[in-house]
């Protein structure tokens, strides 16, 4: 144990420490063959019953997590020595599946026979095999490490007197038998929640019991209910949390204000959307006499009310983030905090954490300091109001006269910060997002495009600056904290993206490792193209997903060496942990001893941060998937009434079985199946992202403008089928390049910008982001998958829904 480099860490956690996981893995790596538990106990100098029991538990935990394999000879071995991998099962509605292994580019194929030993969502240990006759690399399931134990949502049916549930998630390709005494009063076609009592095997069917009946009226509310349960999102407040918040008052206690910097006279304001209910950030800036600005970013002091290890903290950590569905919000914190005590509502005292910064006239962050304060927001402003004020709206300028000059100064600061972002090469995404407008029945009445103006971007730049300051502060002090990490795109993703661009007459410079600046200039060069939104989406897909991690590797998209989330502790748990770390450091500077402070500061260990990073990243992905499910259902529900109508759109994706079309202004995608095209054999060119008719020569390519008719809506699969009316070839290389635009300058150009690339930049990009020489992209292998027709169940449900609506409409008339 004395050679264990993690001995001190283990001694901090356990009174009678045992070798760390890392040391056990290192020991087995040096060993030529697997070892039994008794052999490991001798070789690792384990003594006494307590240590032996600790070793037994640790080995079992390492086996559960896939770090070790327990062989038939009762020995522990390294999975890589046995050519085994750990991964997550991804099911398919046709019975087969895939194994997603972290760190591998391609998923491994699981045959329908292998899928009988596991279900979608299981974490398994598997053995990679050779390729099948279709060239797919297969895998054999060795053991289920962590079975999917969550509840399953589906519809209840009866057939020949036997009750069963068909899962709503098509990746669960099995029915669940329900014994007669476990039905809970569900009737034919009802949406129910099932708990498995017997998992499906090669010889037996799945058996379960109904634990909740959601009803048969499938609407927006039920779509949210299904998503919450399918993705295991916590939505019920535990009784202990209810009890903890029951004693909270609406006003900030006077004793809480003591010892804080008083900023109540500083004209801080909140700027949010019209429908926002929780306000966690306020801003103010003023011009410095010598040039540049002083910027105050005040953030709600959630950490004062949510203390570590309390029921409230445990539930906030469990949720990880607030989940914003189109029609409702599942908050991370109870409403008394999120919309009350922690929300920076106007004209009331609130506790806050402040990041006060100095910014040079060139937009360079020259200084920052953090402190705890008390504030009173001088106004609750909206993006629309601020934009109109900046545009000269006289009525609003009179209404908010005392604040106008401060808002104009914020706008001046924004313009400098925006230019500084361009100089360092940060990528600016101008995404078009859909906003659903609901009617009285909570169905989509229409879909509108959200408009981003300088007020949105102004707040965004202020928040980025505060996040950078927070990241630098904890990093300089070497304090364990969660950084917001955006890794560089993989070489394969870059090659694939560059191939698509080449087909469209575009180019991404930078070789195999393009810099953020290369992506930013590409986006600027295509800004005026009709397919700009599609290209931006493809660019995003070519990049890696941002995560939380205590190991700082920089933020590629923003071209920053250090970045963390500090500005939204009401709705993001990583921000709350960062506030605690900053408070701990501030108290430590004043000579405070111990891991906790009087106002909610806390010192986390690196081990805690590693676990939190994984959990918070998972919670973010979980929320994204759930909201996407509901949005897809709402879009399908909206399109049910559009069957037979004709729309214009653009080809957004091409596959071997057809192409997807994104409808103009609606942001809704549907499939034109290859079988519905002209009578011809179509070949899929994956590199060129196009379908080509062998006889006619007709080509359908990414970016082509098309006119389509809505043929069918598959509510079960959340998919929409189109048929092609006409198509128009997308022009190649439309729009000036960034270099050509720069020659003409900015004068008289609507929305145009000249990218200034100088030697001195605002924030020096990580050296890992620097480019290399260009390499020719490799051609990808062809793919030819077939689409499936809607299931009989789907057609039944869709027909019943349509008939029900028609009947309601008739009664109303």
Curated annotation (Swiss-Prot):
Stimulated by the presence of a monovalent cation. Highly unstable in exponential growth phase. This instability is due to the binding of SsrA/tmRNA and its associated protein SmpB to the C-terminal region of RNase R. In contrast, RNase R becomes stabilized upon entry into stationary phase. The difference in stability between exponential and stationary phase is due to the acetylation of a single lysine residue. CDD domains: S1_RNase_R (cd04471). Its main location: cytoplasm. Changing residue 272 to N: Loss of RNase activity, but exhibits helicase activity. Keywords: Acetylation, Cytoplasm, Exonuclease, Hydrolase, Nuclease, RNA-binding, Stress response, Virulence. It holds the Pfam family HTH_12. Induction: Induced seven- to eightfold by cold shock. Induction is mainly a result of the stabilization of the rnr transcripts. Also induced at stationary phase. Residues 731-813 are annotated as: Disordered. PROSITE patterns: RIBONUCLEASE_II, S1. It catalyses: Exonucleolytic cleavage in the 3'- to 5'-direction to yield nucleoside 5'-phosphates. One of its GO terms (cellular component) is cytosol. One of its GO terms (biological process) is response to stress. Its EC number is 3.1.13.1. Belongs to the RNR ribonuclease family. RNase R subfamily. Monomer. This is Ribonuclease R. It comes from Escherichia coli (strain K12).
């Amino acid at each position: 144990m004395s050679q264990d480099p993690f001995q001190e860490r283990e001694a901090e956690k356990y009174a009678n420490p045992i070798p760390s996981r890392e040391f056990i893995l290192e020991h087995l790596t040096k060993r030529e063959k697997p070892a039994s538990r008794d052999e490991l106990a001798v070789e690792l100098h384990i003594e006494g019953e307590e240590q032996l029991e600790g070793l037994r538990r640790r080995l079992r935990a390492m086996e559960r997590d896939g770090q070790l394999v327990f062989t038939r000879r009762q020995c522990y071995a390294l999975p890589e020595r046995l050519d085994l991998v750990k991964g997550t099962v991804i099911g398919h509605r046709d019975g087969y599946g895939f194994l997603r292994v972290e760190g591998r580019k391609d998923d491994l194929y699981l045959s329908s026979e292998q899928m009988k030993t596991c279900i979608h969502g299981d974490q398994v240990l598997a053995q990679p095999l050779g390729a099948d006759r279709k060239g797919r690399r297969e895998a054999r399931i060795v053991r289920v490490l962590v079975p999917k134990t969550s509840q399953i949502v589906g519809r209840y049916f009866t057939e020949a007197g036997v009750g069963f549930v068909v899962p709503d998630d098509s990746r669960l390709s099995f029915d669940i038998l329900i014994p007669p005494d476990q039905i809970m009063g569900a009737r034919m076609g009802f949406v129910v929640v099932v708990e498995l009592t017997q998992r499906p095997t090669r010889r037996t069917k799945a058996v379960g019991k109904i634990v909740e009946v959601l009803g048969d009226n499938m609407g927006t509310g039920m779509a949210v209910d299904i998503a919450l349960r399918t993705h295991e999102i916590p939505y019920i407040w535990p009784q202990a949390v209810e009890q903890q918040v029951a004693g909270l008052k609406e006003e900030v206690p006077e004793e809480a204000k003591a010892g804080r910097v008083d900023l109540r006279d500083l004209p801080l304001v909140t700027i949010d959307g019209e429908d926002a209910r929780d306000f966690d950030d306020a801003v103010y800036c003023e011009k410095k006499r010598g040039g540049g600005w002083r910027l105050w970013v005040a953030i709600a002091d959630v950490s004062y009310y949510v203390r570590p290890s309390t029921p409230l903290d445990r539930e906030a950590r469990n949720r990880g983030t607030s989940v914003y569905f189109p029609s409702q919000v599942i908050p991370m914190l109870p409403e008394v905090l999120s919309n009350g005590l922690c929300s920076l509502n106007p004209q009331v005292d609130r506790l806050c954490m402040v990041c006060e910064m100095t910014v040079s006239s060139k937009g360079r962050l020259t200084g920052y300091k953090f402190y705890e304060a008390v504030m009173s927001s001088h106004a609750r402003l909206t993006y629309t109001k601020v934009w109109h004020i900046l545009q000269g709206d006289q009525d609003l300028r009179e209404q908010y006269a005392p604040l106008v000059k401060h808002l104009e100064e914020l706008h001046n600061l924004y313009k400098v910060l925006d230019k500084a972002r361009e100089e360092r090469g940060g990528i600016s995404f101008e995404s078009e997002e859909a906003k659903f407008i609901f009617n009285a029945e909570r169905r989509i009445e229409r879909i509108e495009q959200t408009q981003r103006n300088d007020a949105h971007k102004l707040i965004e730049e202020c928040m980025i600056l505060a996040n950078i300051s927070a990241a630098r502060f904890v990093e300089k002090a070497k304090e364990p904290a969660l950084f917001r990490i955006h890794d560089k795109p993989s070489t394969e993703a870059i090659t694939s993206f560059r191939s698509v661009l080449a087909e469209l007459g575009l180019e991404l410079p930078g070789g195999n490792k393009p810099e953020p600046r290369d992506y930013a200039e590409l986006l600027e060069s295509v800004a005026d193209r009709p397919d700009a939104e599609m290209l931006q989406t493809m660019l995003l897909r070519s990049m890696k997903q941002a995560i939380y991690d205590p190991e700082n590797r920089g933020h590629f998209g923003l071209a920053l060496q250090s970045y963390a989330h500090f500005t939204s502790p009401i709705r993001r748990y990583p921000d709350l942990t960062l506030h605690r770390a900053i408070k701990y450091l501030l108290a430590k500077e004043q000579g405070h001893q111990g891991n906790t402070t009087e106002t909610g500061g806390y010192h986390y260990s690196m081990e805690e941060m590693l676990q939190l990073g994984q959990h918070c990243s998972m919670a973010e992905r979980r929320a994204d998937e759930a909201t996407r499910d509901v949005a897809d259902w709402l879009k399908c529900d909206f399109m049910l009434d559009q069957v037979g109508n004709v729309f214009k759109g653009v080809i957004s994706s091409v596959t071997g079985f057809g192409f997807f079309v994104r409808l103009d202004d609606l942001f809704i995608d549907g499939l034109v199946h290859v079988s519905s095209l002209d009578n011809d054999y179509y070949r899929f060119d994956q590199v060129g992202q196009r379908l080509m008719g062998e006889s006619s020569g007709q080509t359908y390519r990414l970016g082509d403008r098309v006119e389509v008719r809505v043929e069918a809506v598959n509510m079960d699969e959340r998919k929409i089928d189109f048929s092609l009316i006409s198509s128009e070839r997308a022009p190649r290389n439309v729009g000036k390049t960034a270099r050509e635009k720069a020659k003409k300058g900015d004068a008289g150009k609507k929305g145009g910008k000249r990218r200034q690339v100088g030697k001195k930049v605002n924030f020096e990009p990580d050296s890992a982001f620097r480019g290399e020489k260009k390499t020719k992209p490799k051609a990808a292998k062809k793919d030819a998958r077939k689409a499936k027709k809607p299931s009989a169940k789907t057609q039944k449900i869709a027909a019943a829904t349509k008939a029900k609506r028609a009947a309601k409409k008739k009664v109303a008339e």
